[in-house]
Design a protein with these regions (language model features):
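Bacterial N-terminal signal peptides that target proteins for export
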Residues: 1-10
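Terminal presequence/propeptide segments associated with secretion/organelle targeting
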Residues: 2, 20-752
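Bacterial N-terminal signal peptides
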Residues: 10-19
């Protein structure tokens, strides 16, 4: 009874907070720098950990078991032997890399029965955050020196300052990070990588220290029918029944230090790992995520939001839809293509659908209008003070003018990039070929390594059809100003037969294979760097080399696209970018100053953040959405929608799902197996794989998605609608035990 009373009180407190100025769910907070008011809210909701238990620099706090998974996802260490949980879609690229038609672990799943069977993943790494240093004074001092040197004592105009800030800030931050890494190496610290980043619109700069582990091995994955259950149909939707998890292990050298892959490496022995709870939760239970959210734009101006929706997202949605139709057809008819294109299709379609949801939500919720009202409030605030007027009065007119000035070029740029460099892979290969010779030798090897990997997952038949479809589509979407020269050849020589033109390109180009690409780019390099009889001869060699490379039709096509872009797109984008960035930062600073009495968090930038909230259902447009899904809903989807490939399931797995053999993982109230659940946590891309903790810091799930009704949350958080979707840890462990027969792994996780 006392437990029930406490839960009821916590839920009531949460609802009161949701109605107040400080919402219980909004915020991506920097651990170690979290506002006291925010922490008070977290504790009122059920957080039982001290600040020191959340964040410390000795390796034993909760933040130390949370990892940056490959610089694109999050993950959590769950055992004393470095076992790691993340999402299936985060491990998808690694799983696909290890799959072949003969050993299709993507389709069939994989269980390592012994440590020796765990499979190393080339190029995969994880980073464990160590600490952060405030470098604000150092960055500002460096910027002031640059401003002084550039102006020679004259007054620095705002436009010039914006250009200099944009031009030099990145270099300053990189230099600070590089110096810190070098010092760490000199001090004998292995695997330390540093990143310096801006926060609060440039009011704060932090240097983050990470320990990077480059020997990460696949241990367990379910078949993609479970790990991607629902596919594109259910992506960003609720209710969900996706077993979105995969299991890896971190390895280190014999001394426990980061090391590249070696057979003799041993499992990492972390100082801290997450304990798991299978006790479950209720409506209103405390839930906390810790992870690496990639990017949000909560302080973005109304002009910036309008650009995101109507200029940036529209080309992505339109072109990717065409591309993915071609890819899907090939992937379904040829399993080898299905494996090769699995990861890049998933990445493409994820943001394609997200952009559609964002545009729909921004319109439905009136986000731009809400932001315009906020901007009126800001105008009234700075107009009331002379000093504030001087700083901020030109901010909004400048943003309006600058966004308008780049509108057409930005829109066209979206179609160029999505069509030629993200759509037609051979054109991107051609672009890299044309710049290869001018590259530094060290960078050349990086390009070669990238190309070798890219061609492993490439099928020229698919790309040829994609080229034909996208070339025709591009001509229909942009004005004549943005049409490259080769379109006249398509019209005159091929009679606008795009398939014939594409077939000719692919028949004549050397870039359809890695061997062809490498042979083309290296054919003349050796002779051009030999000691020449004269300087003129050396120059002639380089010229001949470039002519040879550019004679390839795919390279020539890429070059003409770049020439068109440089002629009519690059200038307006380059001219306006510094001004927009500077004034958007200024807007952020204005908001923080105007609301200095309120807790504020910085926009996400792939640094470790904590979000706190509660397990919660929601209602939208009269439809109620429960906070939990259970096994019957999964079985119902499979049986009702068997004609949809996204809901396909192997007969033997369906039999297991129907077995009702849930054991200790069954929900204590319903007796059913919990699958996925909703919370009010504030997440975004990059948070995928983030551990979801209860108030005691015990793992109850893995965050993997947001909900369609609030896909505008990267721009504006709606506490009534925005929900985080997580996979219940009981579903995870049940599948490991019952499908995978991996008792050894379950026991490791449970500490037995």
């Amino acid at each position: 009874m006392r437990h029930i009373i406490r839960k009821t009180f916590m839920l009531a407190a949460a609802l009161l907070l949701l109605a107040g100025n400080l919402r219980a769910d909004e915020g991506m907070w920097l651990l170690g720098r979290t506002d006291k008011k925010a922490m008070d809210v977290a504790r009122s909701l059920g957080l039982q950990l001290t600040d020191a238990e959340l964040y410390g620099e000795d390796g034993t706090s909760l933040k130390d078991c949370v990892v940056d998974f490959g610089d694109y996802c999050s993950g959590v260490i769950v055992s004393k032997d470095g076992l790691l949980f993340t999402n299936h879609h985060c491990g998808y690229r690694a799983i696909q890399q290890l799959s072949t038609t003969d050993d299709d672990i993507l389709g069939n799943g994989f269980v390592a029965r012994t440590r020796q069977e765990e499979r190393p993943v080339e190029g995969l790494y994880v980073k464990v955050w160590q600490r952060a240093e405030d470098i604000t004074a150092q960055v500002e001092d460096s910027l002031q020196k640059i401003y002084s040197n550039q102006t020679l004592g004259r007054k620095l105009g705002r436009q010039r300052q914006a250009v200099l800030y944009s031009q030099y800030l990145g270099r300053i931050l990189m230099d600070i990070a590089a110096a810190a890494e070098q010092k760490a190496g000199q001090d004998g610290q292995k695997g330390i990588v540093c990143e310096a980043k801006a926060f609060e619109g440039g009011r704060l700069y932090l240097l983050n220290f990470y320990r990077q582990y480059s020997d990460v091995r696949l241990v367990f994955t379910v078949p993609q029918t479970l790990g991607k259950f629902g596919g594109d149909t259910d992506n960003w939707m609720w209710p969900r029944q996706t077993a979105d998890f995969s299991v890896f292990r971190i390895y280190a050298d014999a001394q426990g230090q980061p090391a590249d892959y070696a057979a003799e490496n041993v499992p990492l022995q972390p100082k801290r790992w997450a304990r798991v709870s299978i006790d479950g939760f209720d409506q209103g239970s405390y839930c906390m995520t810790i992870g690496y959210p990639g990017s949000t734009s909560r302080y973005l101006s109304s002009y910036g939001i309008d650009e995101r929706v109507n200029v940036t997202n529209i080309p992505m949605i339109q072109v990717r839809g065409k591309k993915q139709e071609v890819w899907t057809r090939w992937m379904r008819q040829d399993r080898s293509v299905g494996i090769k294109y699995a990861s890049k299709y998933a990445s493409s379609s994820n943001y394609w659908k997200n952009s559609q949801g964002m545009n729909e939500a921004v319109s439905r919720l009136g986000i731009i209008e809400q932001k315009q009202e906020k901007e009126q409030e800001i105008r009234r605030w700075f107009s009331a003070d002379k000093e504030r007027r001087a700083r901020f009065a030109r901010m909004f007119p400048t943003l309006k003018k600058s966004y308008k000035a780049r509108h057409d070029a930005r829109y066209a740029s979206g179609f160029v990039n999505e069509t030629f460099f993200r759509g037609m892979e051979i054109v991107n290969f051609g672009r890299l070929a044309s710049t290869y010779a001018a590259s530094h030798p060290n960078y050349r090897q990086t390009v070669v390594d990238y190309m070798r990997t890219a061609y492993k997952d490439y099928d020229p038949r698919v790309d040829e059809e994609t080229m034909a479809v996208l070339l025709e589509n591009y001509a229909q979407q942009v004005s004549s100003k943005y049409i490259p020269r080769f379109y006249s050849v398509i019209r005159k020589k091929y009679g606008n037969d795009y398939r014939a033109y594409a077939h000719d390109i692919f028949t004549k180009s050397k870039l359809t294979t890695f061997e062809g690409w490498y042979g083309l780019t290296n054919a003349k390099v050796r002779s051009s760097v030999q000691i020449a009889d004269s300087l003129e001869q050396a120059v002639l060699d380089e010229k001949a080399y470039r002519q040879y490379v550019e004679s390839d039709p795919a390279v020539a096509l890429a070059k003409q696209v770049q020439e068109m872009s440089e002629s009519v797109i690059t200038a307006p984008l380059t001219r306006t970018a510094p001004t927009i960035a500077y004034n958007e930062n200024l807007l952020t600073q204005a908001v923080l100053e105007m609301e200095m009495d309120k807790p504020h968090y910085s926009d996400a930038n792939f640094t470790q953040r904590m979000s706190f909230g509660i397990v919660s259902d929601y209602t939208n447009a009269g439809t109620h959405h429960d906070f939990l899904t259970t096994m019957p809903s999964l079985i119902e989807k499979i049986e009702k929608h068997g004609d949809n490939p996204d809901y396909a399931m192997q007969a033997e797995i369906l039999a297991l799902l129907k077995s009702h053999d849930y054991g200790r993982y069954a929900d204590k109230k319903s007796g059913e197996l919990p699958l996925c659940f909703l919370t009010t946590n504030d997440i975004t891309g990059g948070n995928s794989g983030s551990p979801m903790f209860n108030g005691r810091g015990e793992l109850i799930g893995l965050a993997f998605d947001g909900n369609w009704d609030a896909l505008s949350s990267d721009i504006s958080f709606d506490a009534n609608l925005t929900r985080c979707i997580g996979v219940d840890i009981r579903f995870v462990l049940w599948l490991m035990e019952k499908w995978g027969k991996a008792d050894h792994l379950v026991n490791e996780v449970m500490g037995k």
